[in-house]
Amino acid sequence: MQLSPSEISGLIKQRIEKFDNSVELKSEGTIVSVADGIVTIYGLNDVAAGEMIKLPGDVYGLALNLNTDSVGAVVLGDYEHIKEGDKAYCTGRILEVPVGEALLGRVVDALGNPIDGKGEVATDLTSPIEKIAPGVIWRKSVDQALQTGIKSIDSMVPIGRGQRELIIGDRQIGKTAIAVDTIINQKGTGVKCIYVAIGQKASTIANIVRQLEEHGAMEHAIIVAATASDSAALQYIAPYAGCSMGEYFRDRGQDALIVYDDLTKQAWAYRQISLLLRRPPGREAYPGDVFYLHSRLLERAARVNEEYVEKFTNGEVKGKTGSLTALPIIETQAGDISAFVPTNVISITDGQIFLETDLFNSGLRPAINPGNSVSRVGGAAQTKIIKKLGGGIRLALAQYRELEAFSQFASDLDEATRAQLNRGQRVTELLKQKQFSTLSVALMALSLYAADNGYLDNLEVSEVIPFESALHALAETKYSDVIAEINETGKYDADIADKLKIIVEDCKANQAW
């Protein structure tokens, strides 16, 4: 086939028009060492701190050390195929994770990849794992209660929406049980929950997922899992990933709760990474910025005002405040709360729930020590009826603890002291609560009213829990309208007090326990 000169010139013109003369600029470096999940890269002069670096085999690294002529990065995934001499490239992006409603009911890893076998997460939205916390001007004071359903917490150490409340104690003492009960109690309240498991066994996480599913709580929960078999890098970034997922709800005028279980293991992972990166060790071999590790995470839990939500959503959501409540967990060694990481997190948070081994072993569960436990901002958020009735509980316990030690040395006690000891014993018994048996505001108020007004004083200590069960059963069947009214309003006045009195006296008269 012969082409005429005009056709040839036409083809040449077409080729010239289609010719792509764009230049692709890539910042390239060479891997000079790889060991223990840390790669050292020569070159990459344009890399930024916290930037993702593309490594061979569709694996990414996180730039943490920026030296004069090299970059120290931690590998996010498998690094066995990476070898000396391989090329690495800048991406110009910082690490992002998927966010959105589609994550509810799912179990994901620290990078947001699903690990529950239910297929891909149907969301296109992503968010950086590192964000600056809202400034003072965008915040609103904490004045809405976050009910845990646990008597000893809601009455003595109340938690508000947007608060950071530390749960601290030794291992195997019920820290996770409190967090799981709190997540279960948010069912039907509209509060979205994120549970971040750091450095736990996969079987333990599977058990928590099963418990949440059994109690219908997975519908409003996201599980972010960085198991003990995952790399230190994934255990380090998991809390930040979970926080970004919670901020999605906070910034859109909704309420969210995030549990970090536990931040001690995150600090261990960060210490491991820092030592491998040859950063100078400080106290307990932790790096100098271990305080900042936790402070920048926990400061992101906040209650934001209407203006912040309206600005963030470009006016789509108006007149709504958002909140992210954080329940960080810290594991102590033999009750030592003066160690480095516990003291750091105590100083960052708005209060702590201190669990004690001796109380746990004596059968008091949840094993909360009311003397060391405090809520710095939750009092303003406490439900009115619980605040009114819970004050007497704390006082009775404080007097009981003081007199209990004294009474061991005194043989003859006056009537008033004996009455205080009796009241304290019964209040202590009343605060015992089994796991997965959270209470509504009304039923909790009923129990507190009975204790406050001396209705438990003439019962045997062993009869307190059966009496409470009978009281709740009677209230839910015969006085359901009163229970519904208290749950709806949360107020306390003479009328409500009279109604509570009628219920308690009815139960006492029947002696149905």
Swiss-Prot record:
Q: What class of enzyme is it?
A: translocase
Assigned keywords, A-Z: ATP synthesis, ATP-binding, Cell inner membrane, Cell membrane, CF(1), Hydrogen ion transport, Ion transport, Membrane, Nucleotide-binding, Translocase, Transport
* Gene3D superfamilies according to UniProt: 2.40.30.20, ATP synthase alpha/beta chain, C-terminal domain, P-loop containing nucleotide triphosphate hydrolases
Q: Which residues form the signal peptide?
A: none
Q: Where does ATP bind?
A: 169-176
Task: Cite the record's note on assembly.
Answer: F-type ATPases have 2 components, CF(1) - the catalytic core - and CF(0) - the membrane proton channel. CF(1) has five subunits: alpha(3), beta(3), gamma(1), delta(1), epsilon(1). CF(0) has three main subunits: a(1), b(2) and c(9-12). The alpha and beta chains form an alternating ring which encloses part of the gamma chain. CF(1) is attached to CF(0) by a central stalk formed by the gamma and epsilon chains, while a peripheral stalk is formed by the delta and b chains.
Query: What's the protein called, per UniProt?
Result: ATP synthase subunit alpha
What organism does this protein naturally occur in?
Francisella tularensis subsp. tularensis (strain SCHU S4 / Schu 4)
